[in-house]
């Protein structure tokens, strides 16, 4: 899970 993503999820 990425901490620097808008949501705690893996990008598409």
From Swiss-Prot:
Tissue distribution: Expressed by the venom gland.
> Which keywords does this Swiss-Prot/TrEMBL entry list?
Hypotensive agent, Metalloenzyme inhibitor, Metalloprotease inhibitor, Pharmaceutical, Protease inhibitor, Pyrrolidone carboxylic acid, Secreted, Toxin
- Give the Pyrrolidone carboxylic acid positions (modified residues): 1, 4
UniProt KW Signal keyword: no
GO cellular component, alphabetical, reads: extracellular region
* Superkingdom classification of source: Eukaryota
GO BP, sorted A to Z:
regulation of blood pressure
Name where it's found: Secreted
What Gene Ontology molecular function terms does this protein carry?
Answer: peptidase inhibitor activity; toxin activity
Q: Which pairs of positions does the record mark as disulfide bonds?
A: none
The keyword Secreted belongs to this UniProt entry's keyword annotation: yes
Main subcellular location of this protein, as a coarse class: secreted
* Anything else known: Bradykinin-potentiating peptide 9a-F is present only in female snakes.
Similarity comment: Belongs to the bradykinin-potentiating peptide family.
Q: What is this protein called?
A: Bradykinin-potentiating peptide 12c
Q: Highest lineage ranks of the organism?
A: Eukaryota, Metazoa, Chordata, Craniata, Vertebrata
């Amino acid at each position: 899970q990425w901490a620097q993503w808008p949501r705690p999820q893996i990008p598409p």
